[in-house]
Amino acid sequence: ASPINSHFTPYANYMPGYEDDVIMAAGTFIQGASIELSADGPIRPPYVAYVQGGLTYSHVKIAICSAIDALIEKELLTIS
C-alpha cells in the first residue's frame, strides 16, 4: 500500500548477512523519512516477514492490518 514504487514487482536477491535470498520492502516518505516502515523476509517456508521499524505505532499497525487483509482477500492466508 506504499505510494512509492507500489506498482513494481519485488524480486528476491542475495544480501550479505542473510542465509537465503530476501525481499526488502520500504514504504517511504509518507512523513518525511526513509526509515518510517520497512520489512524483509527470507524466501523459504514458512515465508515470514520481519517488520524492521516504524516511526509511529499507528502507522505500523495500519500497514500490518492492511497487509493481512490483502492476503486474506487473495486467499493466501486463513485465520481460524
Swiss-Prot record:
It comes from the Bacteria. Pfam families: Met_gamma_lyase (PF06838). Disulfide bonds: none annotated. To B.cereus similar ORF in glnR 5'region. This is Uncharacterized protein in glnR 5'region.
